[in-house]
Structure formats: structure tokens, C-alpha cells
């Protein structure tokens, strides 16, 4: 079945297909204001009910093809540094479980691929993020994927290695899974003391965001510490990830592809 992306997106509320309209400019201004304020913008119910249902069906159908990985990582995705004190944030490692459904499970015409290929989508995201260098990730296994997390899974506190992420909530778990973040905690320096407070559960600067199916999120995660709280229940959490990079033709290195 081939999907028309215009039938999956709430274009009345989010007129990304009408860039010359006043409604589009108001939307763009609102998103950019949120990004400037907290590094996070959410377009609630960007997908309509039909779009959500189509995304869930595709994710469930492809879930058996998910690749799973388990490791321990710190917030910086770096190795341990024995020259630092044992309680230093760089030396705090946490279990990380990750499962993703590769992009080759979402062929042209599927709901997920239709949104990614919708001609107005990329220009809107680029304009919202105000990115001059903005290219689609060229990796055929990772340009648009679905992250899958199950009971006990989550994503510990970390900083992103890229400037921004573009994600779309597809299905929530029965419990847990809140998106927690500290905006711009290291915008002007590493700020290790405050990072340590977050890691130890002592910070009063943590914001909590409960994303719902159909929500599109733009997030500036390089300087904002964030995590996905552990999940519970039988229902898996699905989140679609649209991947963009700063150079054309980029694909994963062998190390990143494992």
C-alpha cells in the first residue's frame, strides 16, 4: 500500500506545504522561539489518527527485524579516564540498551518513508532549525529508522554528538519513557558540577516532557543533557528518527554501524 503523506499529517494545523502563507510563518516563528528558549520544540499531533495507526502497524510488522545492542556508556560516549576522581561525570557509566529497526524495512511508499520523502518536510525542518549545512543521511540502513524500547529499557543521561535530532513519537510503553532534559547545561562550558547533580538525581533544573503518539520533536541535544526514563509494561515504545547531517553523502563507519 502506498501512502499519501498529505493524508497522514494534520496540514490544517501544521501547513508545512504552504511556505508562503501567514500560517506557515507563524508556525515557523513559534517553533524557533521554543528552540531558542529551551532547545526543544514539539509539534503536538503532527500526525493525525490515520497516520499514527499506519506508523504503529509498520513498526509492529518490522519489529522482528530490530537490531539490539547492550553496553555501558557515560554521558559523553567516551572512555573512562582514570586521571579523574571516581565521582567525576566522565567516570559515571550506565547500562544502555538500544534496539532499532533499520531503514530498509521501510520501503518507498510506506507511511514512514512517505513522511520523510514529502517534499515540504525537509525544507520545513531546515528552516525551523536554521541550519545552513543540512543534508539527508545517505546511509540506506539508517536514514529513517524506528527506535524500539521494551520494559526495563531506556536511554541514560547523555549529550548528543550531533547538533540536533528530529523524531516522531509512534507508540508509548505502558509506563515510564518520559523525556527528561536540562536545557543548555553546557552551552558556555562543561559545567561538570551541575551535570553531576543531574546524574545523582539532585538537580532542580530537569524538565520532563511526556510525548504522545503523533508528536514531532525537534531537539538541540549537543549541549542539553537528556535521557529517556526506564520503561515498564508489555507494550514497546516506538520512536521514528529522521536523520540529517552537515555533509552530503555521509554513511555510518563500520564501528557506528555495529
Please provide the spans of the model-predicted regions:
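Short conserved micro-motifs at the rims of enzyme active sites and ligand-binding pockets
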Residues: 192, 229-231, 251-255
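Signature of the catalytic double-stranded beta-helix
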Residues: 47-48, 58, 62, 66, ...
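Catalytic core of non-heme Fe(II) oxygenases with the double-stranded beta-helix
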Residues: 107-113, 122-216
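Conserved "cap/hinge" positions at secondary-structure junctions
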Residues: 45, 221-222
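Short beta-strand His + acidic residue motifs that chelate non-heme Fe in jelly-roll/DSBH
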Residues: 155, 225-232
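Fe(II)/2-oxoglutarate
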Residues: 1-37
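A short hydrophobic beta-strand segment most commonly corresponding to one strand
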Residues: 165-168, 218, 234-249
Amino acid at each position: 500500500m502506498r501512502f499519501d503523506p498529505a493524508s497522514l499529517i494534520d496540514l490544517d494545523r501544521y501547513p508545512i506545504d504552504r511556505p508562503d502563507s501567514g500560517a506557515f510563518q507563524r508556525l515557523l516563528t513559534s517553533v524557533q522561539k521554543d528552540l531558542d528558549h529551551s532547545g526543544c520544540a514539539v509539534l503536538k499531533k503532527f500526525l493525525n489518527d490515520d497516520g499514527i495507526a499506519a506508523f504503529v502497524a509498520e513498526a509492529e510488522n518490522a519489529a522482528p527485524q530490530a537490531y539490539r545492542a547492550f553496553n555501558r556508556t557515560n554521558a559523553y560516549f567516551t572512555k573512562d579516564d582514570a586521571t579523574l576522581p571516581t565521582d567525576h561525570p566522565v567516570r559515571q557509566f550506565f547500562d544502555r540498551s538500544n534496539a532499532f529497526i533499520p531503514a530498509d524495512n521501510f520501503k518507498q511508499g510506506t507511511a514512514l518513508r512517505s513522511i520523510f520523502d514529502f517534499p515540504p518536510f525537509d525544507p520545513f525542518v531546515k528552516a525551523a532549525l536554521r541550519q545552513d549545512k543540512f543534508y539527508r543521511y545517505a546511509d540506506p540502513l539508517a536514514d529513517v529508522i524506528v527506535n524500539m524500547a521494551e520494559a526495563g529499557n531506556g536511554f541514560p543521561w547523555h549529550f548528543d554528538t550531533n547538533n540536533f535530532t528530529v523524531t516522531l513519537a509512534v507508540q508509548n510503553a505502558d509506563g515510564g519513557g518520559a523525556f527528561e532534559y536540562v536545557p543548555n547545561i553546557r552551552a558556555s562550558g562543561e559545567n561538570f558540577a551541575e551535570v553531576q547533580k543531574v546524574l545523582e538525581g539532585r538537580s532542580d533544573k530537569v524538565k520532563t516532557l511526556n510525548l504522545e503518539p503523533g508528536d514531532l520533536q525537534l531537539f538541540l541535544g549537543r549541549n542539553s543533557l537528556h535521557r529517556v526514563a526506564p520503561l515498564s509494561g508489555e507494550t514497546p515504545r516506538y520512536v521514528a528518527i529522521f536523520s540529517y547531517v552537515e555533509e552530503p553523502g555521509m554513511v555510518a563507519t563500520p564501528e557506528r554501524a555495529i
